[in-house]
């Protein structure tokens, strides 16, 4: 039985810069940090040979985000657009979208434009982390699709 979403993994091109952004700008907490250098168990679990990577597990209010920077195999820059297949973005629910938008801009987050009010109870805006991964800020007041229990 599936009991919930545990984490979302995000590939980054500069581990230290990403870790600083996700902890200082977004307020996530580091709960685990590891380095892998051709570890047999990691190779088998991930399905790649000879991996060399850094990983950090970050705690959010109701799930985890995992940051990965691989140096082997050599990563490719496959930044997605919101319309591409795969995992094109993560959404962070916020309680004051304009305040978070303004605050994250001071941390260097680049947004596609200004906050959009989608309806009376929903607002959203897309931006990118320092590695170019898409992050949506989402303010929703409707209890049916608001944040799950913490």
Segments (PLM) and residue ranges:
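Acetyl-CoA-dependent GNAT
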Residues: 69-75, 139-140
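Core segments of cupin and vicinal oxygen chelate
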Residues: 11-62, 106
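Short beta->alpha connector loops
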Residues: 49, 72-73, 96-97, 117-118
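A short, acidic/glycine-rich surface segment
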Residues: 39-44, 74-78, 145-147
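Vicinal oxygen chelate
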Residues: 5-13, 33, 54-66, 70, 78-150, ...
């Amino acid at each position: 039985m599936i009991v919930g979403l545990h984490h979302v993994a995000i590939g980054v091109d500069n581990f230290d810069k990403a870790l600083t952004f996700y902890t200082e700008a977004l307020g996530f907490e580091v709960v685990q940090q590891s380095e892998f250098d051709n570890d047999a168990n990691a190779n088998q679990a991930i399905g790649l040979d000879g991996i060399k990577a850094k990983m950090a597990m970050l705690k959010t209010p109701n799930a985890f985000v995992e940051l990965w920077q691989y140096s082997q195999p050599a990563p490719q820059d496959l930044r997605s657009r919101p319309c591409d297949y795969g995992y094109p973005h993560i959404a962070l629910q916020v309680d004051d979208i304009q305040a978070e938008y303004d605050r994250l801009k001071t941390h260097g987050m680049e947004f596609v434009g200004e906050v959009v009010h989608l309806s009376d109870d929903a607002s959203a805006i897309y931006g990118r982390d320092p590695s170019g991964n898409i992050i949506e800020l989402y303010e929703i007041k409707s209890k049916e699709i608001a944040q799950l229990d913490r």
